[in-house]
Regions:
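Structural motif
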Residues: 15-19, 54-58, 111-113, 133, ...
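Conserved CoA-thioester-binding segment of acyl-CoA-metabolizing enzymes
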Residues: 1-58, 101
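N-terminal glycine-rich phosphate-binding loop for ADP-containing cofactors
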Residues: 9-11, 21, 73-80, 84-85, ...
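Gly/Ser-rich catalytic serine loop of serine hydrolases
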Residues: 112-122
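Glycine- (often His-adjacent) and acidic-residue-rich active-site loop
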Residues: 48-51, 59-98, 118, 148-150
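Conserved catalytic cysteine-centered active-site region
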Residues: 99-112
Length: 724
């Protein structure tokens, strides 16, 4: 193992090129080797300063620097004392900052030559150099996305962006949202100083800047420096600062997300003191977050679980990588049109079929409108847009499916209709073509009975709007082959979506679980709980949309239809149909003609533009809203527990078998609160562990019904002290 991952090369002009290249992994991260290497390199720079004219910092990896080592932040804690862990992280963080500060003040100019992605800790390293040049190459991405993991930039990112950009600019454009920017956008924001077109141009540009700026210092190390836009005590900044906590609260809707508030505090407090004191303030807030449960949850979900899935964690072994050449989409409505678009965007030829050619053309028009917007925003070029649209072929002729190797049906939700459309094309497509259905409710095994090759039939459930929603739920039927599952996972990754795999069951995983959240909220309405109280509980739990609002958007009539179909299927199988307090409320609203948002009336009233104007007073009158008072946390946890307990049942029944798939599917597919790390992580991290969760479930069951009784499998796992 090399003792130093930062190679040193000095040219005849005295310019030292430092190249970061961790020999033990594919990306550079802030692991122990980097920490030792940085310290040794800074010591050498200081010792040889008189023979150095300047320094270029670059990377041998395609990614400039991948940031902090999240494994170090989450692993190896076990039952260690919290104070011990916090002290260790504090010491490590301060050591990093000390060496970065030495780098930027050792007396010679340093320029970063950013040859790829510089996110999080990677960007923080460059902020400790006097100049930043980025290559505008594929994969180049610049930013401080720590807030999306429940963290703040702990390597000086808060302190230096505030001093570089000003408090308001740093907070609003970099820190609080954590955007990942292309190099030109990063330059516009002020995070980088120059952009070159290729990696080959980086070193010459860096050396040119060094020759022209031999005495360069950081702005904050220069005499007379003031924070751009003013310090917290200046009138212009003092005007907007008091509103920031309220703005954050409105954005978070009361959800337990501590990172944005910690970022705001670190930025403002740090701007009132010298840079060295500011970095200590930043460290304290960083450590409070990284040792907290929310960050641990979010790191697990958005880094480890997501990485597992996108690396093909649920993909069967032993099958070559598959690339779809020609995709046949049946049904050119909203879903079919959008599936055609994302497939064509990934470079695939698409046949878009409907029963009417005008309908098929309207389906293609969906892509044309999206491309018009992309052109106006500078997200694509005319040439690329024309090529994409040329790949979509609207048709009514089943014979145009000749050569299709992947079919995705998005027709009306009827077994008979779906059987019919597959019969039209089954003998036309390639003999081993994937036969996929975008159904969200119908059993895949039943649909597969309508084709000759049931082993090639599979569910490919997209979420609306397809071009924005990142998840695809892949459903295995009873006869679906591993080979077809592998193909569909490859297709999903190719269109830049995240695949989760579930087994066939009515409602699959996502639709089945989200229904319990909605039902629990609606049942509370029927109990006489104030609807606004219920909506507030949903928001403060961290759901993206409040439950009654979401019900209106999904349509109450559709909810009733799915419930009735499910009940009929359960009866046909000899099962017991269980009543729920939500059913009578939905039925009564539909009797009043209140189907939801599209009808202009549901739980809410709507104006002529479809905007909510308030909860319907008739609802309060009917159910004597406010007559029943329950603890706020009970309402929050009724919704969270309903989904979590249903997920346990899905594991028991084999509907879902992967914890990462369940966590990511719940967050990306049905809006389970991100701070929890997903529906399974919510159970694992509950206070008192699984036993604490089981005890609370019993408590909720005693108050609100037996459907909160924990499944026996969960009780047994808790008794053994295990986790999922």
């Amino acid at each position: 193992m090399s003792d130093n991952m930062i190679a040193w090369e000095k040219d005849a002009d005295g310019v030292v090129v430092l190249t970061m290249d961790d020999p033990n992994q594919g990306a550079n991260t802030m692991n122990d080797l980097f920490m030792r290497s940085l310290e040794a390199t800074v010591e050498r720079l200081e010792a040889e300063k008189d023979d150095i004219t300047g320094v270029v910092l670059t990377s041998a990896k395609k990614t400039f620097f991948a940031g902090g080592d999240l494994k170090d932040m989450t692993s190896g804690r076990g039952d260690r004392d919290e104070v011990e862990v916090a002290t260790e992280i504090t010491d490590r963080t301060n050591q990093l900052k000390k060496n970065l500060r030495r780098l930027e003040t050792f007396g010679k100019p340093v320029v970063s030559a950013i040859n790829g992605a510089a996110l999080g800790g990677g960007l923080e390293i460059t902020l400790a150099t006097q100049h930043r040049i980025a290559a505008d190459v594929k994969g180049a991405s610049i930013g401080l996305p720590e807030v999306t993991l429940g963290l703040l930039p702990g390597g000086g990112g808060v302190v230096r962006t505030v001093r570089l950009l000003g408090i308001q600019n740093a907070l609003m454009n970099v820190l609080l949202q954590g955007p990942r920017m292309k190099p030109e956008k990063a330059k516009e924001t002020g995070l980088v100083d120059e952009v070159v077109a290729s990696v080959e141009e980086l070193l010459p540009a860096a050396k040119k800047w060094l020759s022209e700026n031999p005495e360069a210092k950081q702005p904050w190390d220069s005499d007379g420096y003031k924070i751009p836009g003013g310090s917290p005590s200046s009138p212009s900044v003092a005007q907007f600062l008091p509103a920031m906590p309220a703005i954050l609260r409105r954005q978070l809707k009361g959800a337990p997300m501590p990172a944005p508030r910690a970022i705001l505090a670190a930025a403002v407090e740090g701007a009132m003191v010298d840079i060295d004191t500011a970095t200590q303030i930043e460290t304290r807030y960083f450590v409070s977050l990284v040792t907290g449960q929310v960050a641990q949850n979010m790191i697990k979900a958005f880094f480890f679980d997501l990485q597992h899935i996108n690396a093909g964690g649920s993909r069967p072994d032993g099958y070559d990588k598959y690339t779809a050449k020609k995709v046949g989409v049946i049904g050119a409505g909203m879903m079919g049109a959008a599936i055609a678009y994302v497939s064509a965007k990934a470079g695939m030829d698409v046949v878009l079929k409907d029963i009417d050619i005008e309908a098929a053309k309207r389906g293609k028009n969906y892509s044309e409108k999206l491309e018009e917007k992309a052109l106006k925003r500078g997200k694509t070029t005319q040439e690329k847009s024309d090529e994409l649209l040329a790949r979509i072929h609207p048709t009514v002729d089943p014979q145009d499916f000749a050569g299709v190797d992947l079919v995705i049906e998005a027709a009306f939700e009827s077994v008979e209709v779906k059987h019919k459309v597959f019969q039209e094309i089954e003998d036309v497509v390639e003999p081993d073509a994937v036969l996929g259905s975008n159904t969200s409710t119908l059993p895949i095994t039943s649909l597969a009975e309508g084709v000759k090759r049931a082993e090639d039939f599979i569910g490919i459930h997209f979420f609306s709007p397809v071009d924005k929603m990142p998840l695809v739920e892949i459903i295995r039927g009873a006869k679906t082959s591993d080979a077809v599952l592998a193909k569909v996972i490859d297709y999903t990754l190719a269109i830049k979506k995240t695949p989760i795999v579930v087994n066939d069951h009515r409602g699959f995983f996502t639709s089945r679980v989200i229904g319990t959240f909605i039902n629990e909220a609606i049942a509370a309405v029927g109990e006489g709980v104030e609807p606004a109280f219920i909506e507030q509980a949903g928001q403060q739990a961290g759901y993206p949309a409040a439950p009654l609002q979401l019900s209106d958007e999904l349509k109450l009539g559709l909810m009733q239809k799915i419930r009735n179909e499910t009940n009929e299927a359960v009866k046909a199988e000899g099962g017991e149909v269980r009543d729920h307090g939500s059913f009578a409320v939905v039925d009564w609203l539909l009797e009043q003609g209140r189907d939801g948002k599209t009808a202009g009336k549901g739980f809410y009233e709507y104006d002529e533009n479809g905007k909510r104007t308030g909860l319907w007073q008739g609802l309060r009158d009917q159910y004597k809203s406010g007559s029943t008072q329950i603890p706020f946390q009970d309402m929050v946890e009724r919704m969270l527990f309903a989904e979590a307990l249903e997920t346990v049942k899905c594991f028991d029944e084999g509907v879902i078998t992967s914890v990462p798939d369940a966590n990511i599917g719940s967050i990306f597919g049905i809006g389970f609160p991100a701070w929890t790390g997903g529906v399974v992580q919510y159970i694992n991290q509950y206070e008192g562990g699984l036993q604490g969760f089981v005890d609370r479930a019993h408590d909720l069951a005693s108050k609100y019904g037996s459907h909160f009784e924990p499944p026996q499998s969960l009780v047994e796992k808790a008794g053994k002290g295990e986790k999922y």
